[in-house]
Amino acid sequence: GGRNDYAALRKKTDAISCFAVSYDENDTFYVPEEVRAMVEEYKRKKLDTYLSFTNDIIGKRRSEKDRGLLWRLLGDDAAMDRTVEEIVALAASFGVHGVELDYENFAKDEKLLQRYLVFTYRLSMACVQNNLKLRIVLEPSVPFDAGFAKGPEYVVMLYNLHGKHSGPGAKADRAFIEKTLAKMEALPEKRAVALATGGCLWQDYGLFGLKTGERSFITEREAVALANQHHAVPERDEESAALHFTFEADGHETEVWYADSETLNAWITLAANHGIASVSIWRLGGNTDIAQLRSQ
């Protein structure tokens, strides 16, 4: 699992994010037990530990990347200040070194984007006052020239090019990475990127997706097991360095795309060639050869 991947990468890792704090149906923090355990385990090690905050809602009306929740948390100044205080207080109570802000799905709402920007300035100041580091995770679709604060580290997701929302393909490819890195130059330093392990499976993806079955994210280990089980030979795609294969079983055709360490190293090299030295890996667990990742 994640612990094994961390052990394999230990000498190349200088920070770890404990993912994730979300919200319950009353807009109160929901902290899973495994996050508490992870914080306790990693904060004793010689690396920076971040507590990650998302705008996911856990419970009966479960919702990921909930925009309505962000409006309630950031919509007026009193709510925003309360949100800042609560994030900083929780991070301080856990004894972590920093806050990782992973709010998503706000950029298309111009008014919410402006509220979010004000919020990041206030959160940045509060983190400085409380001796906490701040990392802000951003989707590649965010307008990076919108006026972000100097001070935090900005981590841009270099994935989700293909996934459950689309037809088959790699989570990232050269064109997507280079386009996003060019846009990122509008962000203040320090700039970093996040790369995704694993891949996705598409069942019965017909012409233009008119006929489509199950789509699910899978780990590298699961992808390798599927290829072995169905005697499929993965091929490496030139544009993305990702591996892909198809197989037929039980009357269904399935296409699988996934990343291995060679894929991730190609992406890391591309980012490094554009001046990005800091790379986050999402996520640890289910990888077969993660020790092969380059750190430079």
Residue spans for each PLM region:
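Glycan-recognition patch characteristic of GH18 chitinases/ENGases
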Residues: 1-81
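Short, acidic/polar
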Residues: 1-12, 76-92, 139-145, 259-272
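Conserved, mostly hydrophobic/aromatic
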Residues: 16, 101, 154, 193, ...
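A cross-domain feature marking catalytic cores of carbohydrate-active enzymes
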Residues: 20, 51-55, 103-105, 136-140, ...
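Substrate-binding surface in catalytic domains of secreted glycosidases
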Residues: 25-34, 108, 113-226
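Glycan-binding loop/region signatures in secreted carbohydrate-active enzymes
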Residues: 58-69, 197-267
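Active-site groove signature of glycoside hydrolases
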Residues: 82-114, 154-160
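Extracellular low-complexity, Gly/Ser/Thr-rich intrinsically disordered linkers
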Residues: 246-295
